[in-house]
């Protein structure tokens, strides 16, 4: 049975809890708390309030070295706490977000010495580049089709017109608009790094649709 003293203590405890303002914590107290957080929670903490953001910028974990200018990359993808960046020099950088702070993978990056380039013909330029991560973490025996902002993955051998596995298929809108090409559908062969133009279809880009039975 609660005594009058117990009720008084409970009221004081509730009053103290209601009066707590976590946004007004002393910076010297808040700073070590923020620095002890994981990488994800650490970056979430800066959105709590303006006071926390001010303290967050003074923490040791605040490091902008891994930040990438959006103008220096073609595309990015995120999977299993790792950020993959396809850079302007055709390399893939990998940043690991599983630790206390993002770290760039060096020796463990299998693509560090493997630039992804293609042989350009005169006046040929591919201006939309994408990076895709397969479920297995590698891209083998697969075909990627880009169009309408959708990427499809299918384990097929050959569907005709030069479209086969180990290739990337793209359509007219993925090319530099002024490029005079014999076809509006291109095939990029991953093994040879060459682009072929099977044939020109007499339709517009918004009329072309891809359909793969069993994968749609």
Swiss-Prot record:
Coiled coil start-end: none
Pfam family, one: Beta-prop_KIB1-4
Protein name: Putative F-box protein At2g03610
Source taxon at top rank: Eukaryota
Stretches assigned to the F-box domain: 19-69
């Amino acid at each position: 049975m609660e005594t009058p003293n117990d009720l008084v203590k409970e009221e004081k405890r509730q009053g103290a809890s209601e009066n707590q303002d976590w946004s007004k914590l002393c910076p010297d107290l808040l700073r070590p708390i923020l620095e002890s957080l994981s990488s994800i929670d650490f970056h979430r903490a800066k959105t709590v309030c303006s006071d926390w953001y001010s303290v967050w910028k003074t923490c040791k974990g605040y490091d902008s070295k891994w930040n990438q200018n959006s103008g220096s990359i073609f595309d990015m993808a995120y999977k299993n706490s790792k950020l993959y960046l396809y850079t302007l020099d055709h390399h893939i950088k990998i940043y690991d977000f599983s630790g206390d702070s993002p770290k760039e993978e060096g020796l463990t990056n299998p693509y560090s010495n493997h630039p992804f380039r293609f042989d350009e013909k005169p006046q040929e330029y591919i201006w939309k580049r994408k990076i895709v991560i397969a479920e297995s973490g590698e891209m083998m025996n697969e075909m990627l089709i880009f169009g309408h902002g959708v990427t499809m993955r299918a384990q097929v051998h050959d569907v005709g017109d030069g479209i086969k596995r180990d290739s990337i298929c793209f359509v007219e809108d993925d090319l530099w608009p002024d490029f005079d090409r014999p076809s509006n559908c291109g095939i990029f062969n991953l093994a040879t790094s060459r682009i072929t133009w099977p044939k020109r279809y007499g339709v517009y880009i918004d009329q072309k649709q891809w359909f793969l039975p069993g994968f749609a």
